[in-house]
From Swiss-Prot:
This is Serine hydrolase RBBP9. Induction: Following chronic low dose of ionizing radiation, expression is up-regulated in male spleen and down-regulated in female spleen (at protein level). The keyword Hydrolase applies. It holds the Pfam family Ser_hydrolase. It comes from Mus musculus. Expressed in spleen.
Length: 186
């Protein structure tokens, strides 16, 4: 598989300007300092419900996520990244605050991502590199679901106890992980 030439940040739902929200803009700036590497962080359509039927086509046609793309997905964005990788080849997934169910939340249920079983084997077949960041003190996601994602995808898991839902403004570890992917196999 060809070396990656870009990263795409797929944000969590909730709206707000992606470029200025949380760590997204900070990571974008850091990754764009890598020569010949591009990082996209665009505002997503349908930002509140984050419907699969809207987000996945946008990832394909507007963000051009392909086999040379590292998809960095946060929360709902991590879920979109996993569903996308069920049917598309991508270079890598970097999943931040990933989970496996609608958590009994009406908005999550309406998104459509949880209407069928996960195709874990297809994700692994389409994506040779999977890294996950999770925190045991996430106020929205039970650790059990985060751990299930790591186990099912054989992800390289960075487990924290003090990062909550990763809503901080900087994310040094994520930049290091992407840089290590550019240097070759982990």
């Amino acid at each position: 598989m060809a070396s990656p030439n870009k990263a795409v940040i797929v944000p969590g739902n909730g709206g707000g300007d992606v470029a200025t929200h949380g760590w997204y803009g900070w990571v974008k700036k850091g990754l764009e300092q890598i020569p010949g590497f591009q990082c996209l962080a665009k505002n997503m359509p349908d930002p509140i419900t984050a419907r699969e039927s809207i987000w996945l086509p946008f990832m394909e046609t507007e963000l051009h996520c392909d086999e040379k793309t590292i998809i960095i997905g946060h929360s709902s964005g991590a879920i979109a990244a996993m569903r996308y990788a069920e049917t598309h080849q991508v270079y890598a997934l970097v999943l931040v605050s990933a989970y496996t169910s609608d958590l009994g939340d009406e908005n999550e249920r309406a998104s459509g991502y949880f209407s069928r079983p996960w195709q874990w084997e297809k994700i692994k077949a389409n994506c040779p590199h999977i890294v996950q960041f999770g925190s045991t003190d996430d106020p929205f996601l039970p650790w059990k679901e985060q751990q299930e994602v790591a186990d099912r995808l054989d992800a390289k898991l960075y487990k924290f106890t003090d990062r909550g839902h990763f809503q901080n403004t900087e994310f040094h570890e994520l930049i290091s992980v992407v840089k290590s992917m550019l240097k070759g196999p982990e």
